[in-house]
Amino acid sequence: MNGRPSQKGRSRKRAKRGFASWSPGKKAVAILMGVLILLITATVAVVAAKWGKIGGVALNPDKLAISEEAEISGTGYLTVALFGLDTRATDEEMGARSDTIMVASLNRETKEIKLVSVYRDTLLQLSDGAYNKANAAYAYGGEEEAVAMLNKNLDLNIEHYVSVDFSVLVHVIDALGGIDINVEEAENGIDIIPYLNNYVVEVIKNTGVDSAPFTQLGQQHLNGVQATAYARLRYGGGDDYKRTERQREVLEQIAIKAQKAKLSTINKIIDKVFDNVKTNFTLTETIAYAKDVKSYKFGETQGFPYESTTANLDVGDSVVATDLASD
C-alpha cells in the first residue's frame, strides 16, 4: 500500500491537554474559521452588501464519499469543514495545501458545537485510494477532494466548507489594533526568536505589509505580521501539536477582539477578508445560522488522531492513527 508505515514508527498517546482541556471561552477560537465571527458580529445589511466579494464553488454530492451510515447518523447536525490555506507558492487556490484543518459539528436542536482539529500530517486515504498527508487533499482536488477525504476516513456527513487564506490574518489583526500573546520559551530549549523573525520576513514578502522583528519572549502586543509568524512557527518542540495550539491561541484573541469591535472596524475587515474567503454557504444559509449565535454553546473538543504513531513514509514524516475506528 502506498504510504504504509515503516517499522521505525514511534508510538504516541497524548494526554488530553491543550484543545481538549480548554475552557468554553477558549474553544471559541475555531468560530473564526467556521461561521466567520465577522459574519455574526456585523449587521445583516452590511454582510448582504459585501457578500458578492466571497468566492467558492458548489460541491458535487455524488463525489463527497458520504456513506449511508454517516448520512443517517448525521441527521440533525450541521457538519462543516474548515480550511486555513497556505497559498504562498501559487496564485490559484487549486494547488494550495490546507495548512489548518478543522471540523465543526452543530447540533441543530441543542445548539451545541463540537470541534475537531485534524493534524495536517495525518496519513489518510484520498479518493483514488492512495494514502497521503491530510493537507495534500486540498492541493490535489480543492475543497471537494478535501471534504471527501474527511468523510471517507472519519465517517462524516460534510456538505459545507469554509476556506480562508492565512494571509488575511495579517489584515484582520492590524484592523483590530493587534493582539496580546505570551510568546513562551521553546520546549526543547532552542532560541526561537531567529526562527520567528525568519517567518516575519516571509510574511512581509508575501503580504507587502511591513513589521518590526521580534526582540524578546514573554507577554507582548503583536501586530498582524508578528502574530501570523507566531502562528506559523514550526520550531521549538511539540511538532504539529504545539503549532496548532499556537494557531488556536491567535484565533482566540482575534475572536475576542472582533466581538467587541465597532461596526466601522468590522466593515473595514470585511473589505479586506471577504476577497480571501471561499464557501459554499449561501447568504440565506449564513444569516439563518448567524441569528442563533447567542444560543450556541461548546461541547467536547479534541484533536485527531488521539492515539497515533509517527513514521517516515514515501510522503514524508507522517502521523498515523493507531486505532482509526476508536478515533
Task: Report the location of each language-model feature.
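Entry/capping segment at the start of metal-dependent catalytic domains
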Residues: 3-111, 288
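Extracytoplasmic/secreted envelope proteins and their assembly/folding machinery
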Residues: 100, 131, 143-151, 166-170, ...
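Extracytoplasmic
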Residues: 75-78, 95-101, 110-118, 129, ...
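C-terminal solvent-exposed extensions
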Residues: 67-70, 77, 95, 126, ...
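Amphipathic, coiled-coil-like alpha-helical scaffolding segments used for oligomerization/assembly
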Residues: 140-207, 280-286
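Second-shell loop/turn segments in exported
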Residues: 89-92, 132-140, 155-160, 217, ...
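Structured segments of extracytoplasmic/periplasmic soluble domains
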Residues: 83, 89, 109, 121, ...
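Flexible, polar/acidic helix-loop-strand segments at domain edges
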Residues: 174-265
